[in-house]
C-alpha cells in the first residue's frame, strides 16, 4: 500500500493544479450592501466595434491548468493582439484570492470555478458577472476495480460516496437525489446515500480500493489513470444531469459595464482559439505541453481522448445560462449556500458571448462551427 500511495502521489502531483481548478474552494466573501443589478446589456450588440473604447484586461490563471484551452491557444497564436484587446495574465495562488480580486476590481476576468461565484454572491457580493464558460460536466465516478458500471440511481442506494466538498459534481448529484425523492447525508444519519468529505483525490481513491467507500467522485480526468490506481471508472455525474456547469468565465461588474467591447474582443479571440483546438490537435498539444509541463498523453486524454479513454469534461465557452442558474439554485436547495433570496438570473449574462459569436458569423458566414455554437446558445440560454 505504501508503493500504491507513492504512485498516486506522483500521478496526482501532475494533476493537482487541474483538480484545484475544477470547482474552487469555499470562499469567505466580504459582505456588502446589495445593490441593484442592471438588466440592460452593457453595450449594444450592433454597435460598431471600432467606435468603442477598449481598455486592457487583466485575466487570472490558476497554476498550469489547461482547461481554458481557447484562451491559452489564443495567447500563444497572438489572437488577442489581432482582435485589438491587450490581455495581461496574472497567476493567482488560490480560488478564494481570485474571486476576491475580481469582486474588488483587482482582476477583470477569472476563468475557473462555478461554486465560488455563487458563494460570494449569496454572501452579499454584487460585483460579479458570469459571462461565459470554460468547461462543463467534468465529474467522474470511480470505484475499486471489478465494480460494475453504474446504470441508474438505484445502484447508489445504500452506498457511501467520497468526494471533495467544492466538487461541482457532488452538489449536482445531491440535488438530483433530492429531486428523485431520496435522501443524502453524512455517515450515521440513516440517509439513502451517504457522502463523506475528503481533502483530495488520494484518500478518496485509496478508500475505494480498501473498501472504505463504495464510490468516489473525482474531476480533471483522473479516470484516465484509473487502472494504475487499482480502481475503475464506473460512471459519471453527467449520466444523471446534463448539462451542468464546471469552470466559468467571471468578470467584475465595472468591467462588464464600462469595458464591454474589450470583453467581446477577448471572447472572439477565445472562440478562435477554441476553433483552432478542435482542428489542430498536435499543434494545440505542443502549446499546452509548453505551457503546463504536463505529460502529453494526459493532455490528449483530457482534451481529445485516447483509444482507451473518453473524457466526460466538455470544453465550451457558452455561458449555459439555464444550467448555470439551475446549478446555483441547486446549491441553495442542498444547503451549500444560504438562501438569501438572490435572483441568480441577474448575475449570469449572455450578451458578451452572443455578441462575439454574432461578429464571427458575420465575418465567416460559411463557418459551420459558428452556426453550431449559435444553435446551442439559443437552446441553452433563456
Each predicted region: which residue ranges?
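Short, low-complexity disordered leader/linker segments with a strong preference
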Residues: 1-56, 362-382
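Short, glycine-/small- and polar/acidic-enriched structural segments
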Residues: 35-40, 45-197, 207, 214-220, ...
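Solvent-exposed, acidic/flexible segments
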Residues: 60, 64, 91, 95, ...
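Predominant activation on well-ordered alpha-helical scaffold segments within soluble catalytic domains
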Residues: 72, 118, 174, 224, ...
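Short linear loop/turn motifs
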Residues: 88-89, 96, 190-194, 301-308, ...
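Pocket-lining segment of extracytoplasmic ligand-binding domains
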Residues: 115-116, 203-293
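Secondary-structure end/capping motifs
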Residues: 259-342
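Conserved C-terminal helix/tail region of periplasmic/extracytoplasmic solute-binding proteins
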Residues: 329-382
